[in-house]
């Protein structure tokens, strides 16, 4: 296999990172909704923590996307 085909295989594998970020964010907000349903008085604190966690999970997906773009255009 030449380097170009290996590069595109690596780019395809980067999709796993983006898929993982999507699963992480969906898990965070699913847990947030069930936690707020159980304890509505803690909604403000839970929402703040969920947004921080979602931002960190989404950052991993964006890093994976940036690396894939670097591989495509290098």
Curated annotation (Swiss-Prot):
User: Coiled-coil stretches, from where to where?
Assistant: none
Q: Where in the cell is it found?
A: Cell inner membrane
Q: List, alphabetically, the SUPFAM superfamilies matched.
A: F1F0 ATP synthase subunit C
What Pfam families is this protein classified in?
ATP-synt_C
Transmembrane parts of this sequence: 8-28, 52-72
**Family assignment from sequence similarity:** Belongs to the ATPase C chain family.
Q: Which HAMAP family match?
A: ATP_synth_c_bact
Q: What is this protein called?
A: ATP synthase subunit c
